[in-house]
C-alpha cells in the first residue's frame, strides 16, 4: 500500500534515538523528508547521517526553549520547501515515586514534555493547511499509571486531553491530530527502566508475561505505526490515542 508520503516534510522531535528516531526512519523509508531534533549537536548530526542528508536535516534544540517551535518549522520550509506535519516525541521524565520527586524535576519536565509540546503544536497549527497532521508520542500511562513513573503519569494524560481538544478545533480546517501510546517497546529508555530493578531479566520476563503477544515491541514496529498515522493513508483518522503495546491495554 502506498502511504502517500513521498516528498512530504515532517518535523520529528527527539529523533536522535528511541521512538522518535524509529519514526523518522519509517517516514524516510516511505519517501518523506524529515527535520530531526535533539539536544546534542553530535547526536543530531549522527541521526542525519544515518537517515541520509538528502532526506533529513537536523536542528539541535531543547523543547523547553520557547523559540524552538518557530525555528523548526522555518528549518523545514527553508531546507525542503514545505511543511506537512510534526511528530512530538520527547524523552521520558526521570523515574521516581511521589515522595522522591522534587519541584525542580516537575518544573523541568513540565517545560520540556508538556509546554514544549503545546508550543510546537500551536505553531504547527498556525502554519499547516488542509491535509496537515500533528502527532504526539505519549505513553500507555494516559490510560493507567505506571508504577515508578510519577511525573510521566502526571503529564502524559494532560497532553492527551490537549490533543483531543486540538483535534476538535483543527478538524474543520482539514488538519488531523493523533496520539500514539507506546507500551513496552525495546528501546534504551525501557531497558534503563528495567535495569533499575534488582533483576532486570526477571523484570522483563514478568512484563512480557502480561503482554498478550508475550514480547516487547520493536522500535521498527512503532515507527511503521507512526508513519501510517502521519500519512495521507490515514486521512480520516483524527482525535485518536492509539495503543502500540502488544495488547497490554485490556479495556476498550
Predicted regions: what they are:
Residues 9, 16-17:
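Conserved glycine-rich cofactor-binding loop
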Residues 51-66:
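Rossmann-fold cofactor-recognition segment
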Residues 97-98, 102-110, 207:
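Substrate-binding pocket helix/loop in short-chain dehydrogenase/reductase
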Residues 126, 168-172, 235:
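Alpha-helical segment proximal to the catalytic Tyr-Lys
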Residues 135-159, 163-172, 184-185:
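Catalytic loop of short-chain dehydrogenase/reductase
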Residues 144, 227, 238-252:
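Short C-terminal tail/terminal secondary-structure segment
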Residues 177, 181-196:
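Short, flexible catalytic-loop segment of classical short-chain dehydrogenase/reductase
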Amino acid at each position: 500500500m502506498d502511504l502517500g508520503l513521498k516528498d512530504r516534510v515532517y518535523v520529528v522531535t527527539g529523533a536522535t534515538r528511541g521512538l522518535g528516531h524509529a519514526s523518522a526512519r519509517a517516514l524516510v523509508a516511505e519517501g518523506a523528508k524529515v527535520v530531526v531534533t535533539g539536544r546534542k549537536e553530535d547526536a543530531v548530526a549522527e541521526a542525519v547521517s544515518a537517515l541520509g542528508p538528502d532526506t533529513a536535516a537536523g536542528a539541535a534544540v531543547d523543547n523547553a526553549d520557547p523559540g524552538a517551535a518557530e525555528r523548526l518549522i522555518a528549518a523545514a520550509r527553508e531546507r525542503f520547501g514545505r511543511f506537512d506535519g510534526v511528530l512530538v516525541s520527547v524523552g521520558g521524565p526521570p523515574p521516581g515515586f511521589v515522595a522522591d520527586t522534587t519541584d525542580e524535576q516537575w518544573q523541568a519536565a513540565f517545560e520540556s514534555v508538556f509546554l514544549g509540546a503545546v508550543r510546537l503544536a500551536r505553531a504547527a497549527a498556525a502554519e499547516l493547511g488542509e491535509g496537515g497532521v500533528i502527532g504526539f508520542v505519549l505513553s500507555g500511562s494516559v490510560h493507567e499509571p505506571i508504577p515508578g513513573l510519577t511525573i510521566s503519569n502526571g503529564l502524559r494524560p494532560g497532553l492527551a486531553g490537549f490533543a483531543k481538544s486540538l483535534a476538535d478545533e483543527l478538524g474543520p480546517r482539514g488538519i488531523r491530530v493523533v496520539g500514539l501510546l507506546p507500551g513496552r517497546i525495546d528501546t534504551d529508555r525501557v531497558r534503563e527502566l528495567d535495569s533499575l530493578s534488582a533483576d532486570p531479566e526477571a523484570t522483563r520476563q514478568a512484563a512480557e508475561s502480561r503482554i498478550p503477544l508475550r514480547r516487547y515491541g520493536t522500535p521498527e514496529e512503532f515507527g511503521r505505526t507512526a508513519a501510517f498515522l502521519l500519512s495521507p493513508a490515514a486521512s480520516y483518522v483524527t482525535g485518536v490515542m492509539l495503543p502500540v503495546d502488544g495488547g497490554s491495554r485490556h479495556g476498550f
